[in-house]
């Protein structure tokens, strides 16, 4: 194992709009010639960055994009976990990452902040032979953006638990589920679902909807309708601390979905919606004109819902018709355009990309991977993308070995003309086990579709159904 040591950071100097922390012996040099140590600095927009270089640097920089940070604290991070940092450094990788210019939904500057961090690393420490962008959660969306616009600076990408369908689909899938909870279990529009004036408003909505879900559990009809709402919100049918339910154990699947809601899932989602609406300039989600019968027909968990509705002697088609007829939430068009411009993926990859997901992720549904692969294929870049799945439950619940293996796989791909078997689960599993760390669980898996995707028509807003004079007003 390579020894890693930290060195003190000294005074900052300004260069090309970048404020840099420096070590006494630091001089720009190529690849492994750079001195080992810890570096820190800041960018012109206020983002801060850190970097760590090990003894025996192998010449590859891992540029880490971190996930959502509620704030107000906004520290820079250069690895997904302390254990992953130690393991990557021991493998000879250098690490770097920024805070982004602001906490919370930072997509307005995040990709630029990461590229600015790379520029600072090159100036202060040295030019890496290769740079691999590694992203986690919201940072997975950032690294996916770098895969599209970082050619010449980024050589390869690892996305983990990424919000790969982008901010519009993120808000829309969450809206679909919460709208169904309110409409089917309460029967009115008294709980605000969008356009919050503060995080406290979002928390109040989360509390009210969580209470509704709990009140539904004692009855068969309540559980069936809750299951429909949970399925529309892509809530996993496997929960932390529970055995994975059998494919046809629909009662256990519904209980797992309820465990996620009772455990506080909405208390993260709804206050976070406020922090997305603020930089976007309004509500970027909608359900007016959405056909919930069409969505249901494509749901991965529709068998569960059908079974529970039958057991409760409820009319599923009637409930779906009601959801469609009552849907009247409209977007603020500038917010949709902002999210589409800053917080989205097109699939137009420019570098090899490996995307990794647990199969039961409550905050970044594994269905995002299906949507991401669809976009990449439609853009004609399917040969650059590989996806890896882990038999685990929870958001970003990866082992250290899985993180290191994913980075090693992309580095190997950069030395070959194609992927070959590099990202096959058997190959990934064997590599992870060979590290002697904390194990791995790579499996063959095919995610279902993200049915909540709405096609954007930002170039022709007059053609959008809600833009017509007869459309219901926003609420």
Residue map of PLM features:
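C-terminal His-loop and adjacent cap/lid subdomain of alpha/beta-hydrolase
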Residues: 29-475
